[in-house]
Regions:
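Conserved beta-strand segments that form the floor/walls of ligand-binding pockets within enzyme
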Residues: 59, 64, 95-97, 133
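Acetyl-CoA-dependent GNAT
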Residues: 2-62, 66-67, 79, 85, ...
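Short glycine/proline-centered loop/turn elements that form peptide/ligand docking sites
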Residues: 75, 79, 101-104, 121-127
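Active-site beta-strand termini and strand-to-loop segments that position acidic
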Residues: 39-41, 135-138
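Conserved acetyl-CoA-binding loop-helix of GNAT-fold acetyltransferases
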Residues: 71-84, 109-110
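Conserved GNAT acetyl-CoA-binding A-motif
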Residues: 86-98
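Short hydrophobic/aromatic beta-strand or adjacent loop that forms the aromatic wall/cage
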Residues: 33-35, 129-133
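Conserved catalytic-core motifs of GNAT/GCN5-like acyltransferases
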Residues: 95-97, 114-131
Length: 138
């Protein structure tokens, strides 16, 4: 597994995998260098993106794998590589979120992330189940 910074030639892959991304946000991600394409044996297999919260806390906002490659341990590998990248760049904590009805929470807990709060969106334009926040000291 290899994490490579997002580039222009990843456009079609990203658009096929993450339907909420816009042309503008795609370009912003390239410029910000906060998104990686996940590569396995010469093939694009997923996308990982994050942003920095309060100038010092990395917040994972997307880890998406190609549907055909799920269940192979690639998410675990991608998280380990991302956490190594964060440590190498001086970060000591990582934060992420997932809806409580998504399976990803079990992966994150297995990797050492602990629950640290949640947001309720019921009755808002973003009506969805509870958004669960998790953190890990690196």
């Amino acid at each position: 597994m290899e994490l490579r910074f997002l580039k222009e030639d990843d456009h079609d892959f990203v658009m096929s995998l993450e339907h909420r991304v816009t042309e503008e946000s795609f370009r912003q991600r390239i410029a910000a260098r906060n998104s990686f394409v996940l590569w396995e044996q010469g093939e694009r297999v997923g996308l990982l993106s994050y942003f920095i919260l309060w100038e010092r806390i990395p917040f994972l906002n997307h880890l998406i794998l190609c549907e055909s490659r799920r269940g192979e341990g690639l998410g675990t590998q991608a998280m380990a590589l991302w956490e190594d990248f964060l440590r190498e760049n001086g970060y000591r904590i990582a934060v992420l979120s997932t809806q409580v009805d998504e399976r990803a929470q079990f992966l994150y807990r297995r990797l050492g992330y602990v629950d640290c709060g949640g947001l309720v969106f019921h009755g808002t334009p973003f009506d969805q189940p509870l958004e669960l926040f998790l953190r890990k000291v690196l």
